[in-house]
């Protein structure tokens, strides 16, 4: 089975930077172990990408915390994932969900798609919904143990919402 594993926004600013959380830091070793096991999966990473004008954008006005400003350190994918990034497609995205992501994944002819990453309640759920719409007949799942939300409550709420939309939560 051709499985695509989508790794959402595992970037320094979401781990221990401007928007970092203990949950994200705690999840990272589980994600590394998963990637070490998933040797047959085709990897696609997303990378939240903002410019110096972030605070002037719609997102910046609603979340006035500069983060993932290219090419600052906070924008970089976590160092522990660098060996996996070398084997992956990387999609930079200027907002929560990526309309480019389904185009990249379509070229991989997926038979299953699994998502992991940060933040469950923002970018993971946004991309899960986009992928569900783009690939209605492809099983889509989320590994909850390799995700973290802004808060534990919002993480759980996002998982419940994805389940309601027929995204399998494991």
Regions found by a protein language model. Give the residues of each.
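Active-site acidic carboxylates
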Residues: 1-90, 156, 160-163
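A structural signal for isolated positions on well-ordered beta-strands in alpha/beta enzyme cores
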Residues: 4, 42-44, 112-114, 139-141
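Short, well-ordered secondary-structure micro-motifs
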Residues: 18, 55-57, 101-103, 126-128, ...
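Histidine-anchored nucleotide/phosphate-binding helix
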Residues: 32-36, 125-135
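Short, catalytically relevant binding-site loops at active-site mouths
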Residues: 50-52, 74, 96-99, 147-149
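A short glycine-rich beta-strand->turn/loop micro-motif centered on a GG-aromatic cluster
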Residues: 114-118, 138-150, 170
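Structured adenosyl-cofactor binding patch, chiefly the S-adenosyl-L-methionine
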Residues: 147-159
């Amino acid at each position: 089975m051709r499985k695509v594993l989508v790794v959402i926004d595992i970037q320094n600013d979401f781990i221990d930077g401007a928007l970092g959380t203990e949950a994200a830091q705690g999840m990272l070793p589980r994600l590394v172990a998963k990637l070490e096991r998933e040797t047959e999966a085709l990897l696609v990473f997303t990378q939240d990408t903002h410019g110096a004008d972030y605070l002037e954008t719609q997102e910046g006005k609603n979340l006035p915390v500069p983060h993932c400003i290219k090419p600052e350190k906070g924008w970089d994918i976590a160092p522990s994932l660098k060996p996996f990034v070398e084997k992956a497609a990387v999609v930079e995205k200027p907002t929560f969900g990526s309309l480019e992501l389904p185009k990249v994944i379509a070229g991989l002819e997926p038979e299953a798609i699994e998502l992991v990453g940060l933040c469950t309640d923002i970018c993971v759920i946004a991309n899960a919904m986009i992928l569900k719409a783009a690939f209605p007949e492809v099983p889509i799942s989320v590994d909850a143990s390799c995700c973290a939300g802004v808060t534990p409550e919002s993480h759980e709420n996002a998982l419940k919402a994805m389940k309601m939309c027929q995204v399998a939560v494991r």
